[in-house]
């Protein structure tokens, strides 16, 4: 059953049961003091409201029959998946650079199985959800995401998570190139960097690549009364 979500730059209509809510990298690394972003010098002090908003969005999406996909960014314990000096990721990943500057952190940042890699305690995938590891910023790179979505007839993706200007935007952009409709819930995302970075990422998304809404509006669009209005 179709519903319409109020968004910028215009409303967008979608079928929740042919849509997915994507939770990007809500790991200790990105959202918890003592995690990678914090150790690399980024401010994570305002991530708690984002976690609560994601909980709300996930609950509403699951009740409406949306597929929930959780991403975890990181690599194997030996960092083979991160790429060596021949990979730009080796030179640009702030996690890898932080470990090179602080050797005592080697093996602790974004390594599979580590505390840093784990999802935050408040966000727990449920049976029927899909959890995918990803080795780069985009959730489409070297993952089965595209195949999972296409096999289910899913064309609309609603994004939450961290960081708005890095992995969220990268995944939404790649989805745009693959003909997916991408929506970001702005109060369920958080940037890596100053506040203007969040605004710039959202401007890019709503102007060139997708749509921007918020959690309260999203939940309202999934309420039974909204479906009744469309019907």
Swiss-Prot record:
Gene3D superfamilies (alphabetical): Isochorismatase-like
Any Pfam family the entry gives: Isochorismatase
SUPFAM superfamilies attached to this UniProt entry: Isochorismatase-like hydrolases (SSF52499)
EC number from the UniProt entry: 3.5.1.110
Induction pattern: Up-regulated by the nitrogen regulatory protein C (NtrC also called GlnG) and repressed by RutR.
Annotated GO MF terms: hydrolase activity, acting on carbon-nitrogen (but not peptide) bonds, in linear amides
Keyword Hydrolase: yes
Record-annotated active site: 25 (proton acceptor), 134, 167 (nucleophile)
Top-level taxon in the UniProt lineage: Bacteria
CDD domains noted in UniProt: cysteine_hydrolases (cd00431)
UniProt keyword list: Hydrolase
Stretches assigned to coiled coil: none
Biological process terms in GO annotation: nitrogen utilization; uracil catabolic process
Keyword rRNA-binding: no
Catalyzed chemical reaction(s): (Z)-3-ureidoacrylate + H2O + H(+) = (Z)-3-aminoacrylate + NH4(+) + CO2; (Z)-3-ureidoacrylate + H2O = (Z)-3-aminoacrylate + carbamate + H(+); (Z)-2-methylureidoacrylate + H2O + H(+) = (Z)-2-methylaminoacrylate + NH4(+) + CO2
Classification via HAMAP family: RutB
Record's function text: Hydrolyzes ureidoacrylate to form aminoacrylate and carbamate. The carbamate hydrolyzes spontaneously, thereby releasing one of the nitrogen atoms of the pyrimidine ring as ammonia and one of its carbon atoms as CO2.
Family membership: Belongs to the isochorismatase family. RutB subfamily.
Protein name from the UniProt record: Ureidoacrylate amidohydrolase RutB
Organism (species): Escherichia coli O139:H28 (strain E24377A / ETEC)
The gene coding this protein: rutB
């Amino acid at each position: 059953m179709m519903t319409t979500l109020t968004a910028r730059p215009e409303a967008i209509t979608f079928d929740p049961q042919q849509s997915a809510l994507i939770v990007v990298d809500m790991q200790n690394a990105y959202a918890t003091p003592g995690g990678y972003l914090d150790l690399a010098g980024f401010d994570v002090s305002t991530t708690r409201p984002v976690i609560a908003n994601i909980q709300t969005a996930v609950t509403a999406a699951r009740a409406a029959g949306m597929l929930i996909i959780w991403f975890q960014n990181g690599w194997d314990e030996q960092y083979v998946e991160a790429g060596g000096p021949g990979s730009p990721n080796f030179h640009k990943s702030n996690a890898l650079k932080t470990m090179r500057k602080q050797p005592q952190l080697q093996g602790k940042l974004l390594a599979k199985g580590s505390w840093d890699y784990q999802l935050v305690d408040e966000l727990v995938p449920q049976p029927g959800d899909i959890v995918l590891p990803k080795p780069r910023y985009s959730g489409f790179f070297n993952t089965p995401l595209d195949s999972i979505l296409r096999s289910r007839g899913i064309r609309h993706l609603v994004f939450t998570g961290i960081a708005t200007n890095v992995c969220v935007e990268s995944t939404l952009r790649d989805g745009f190139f693959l003909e997916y409709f991408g929506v970001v819930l702005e109060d369920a995302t958080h940037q890596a960097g100053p506040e203007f970075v969040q605004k710039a990422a959202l401007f890019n998304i709503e102007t060139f690549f997708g749509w921007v809404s918020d959690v309260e509006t999203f939940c309202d669009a999934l309420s039974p009364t909204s479906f009744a209005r469309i019907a």
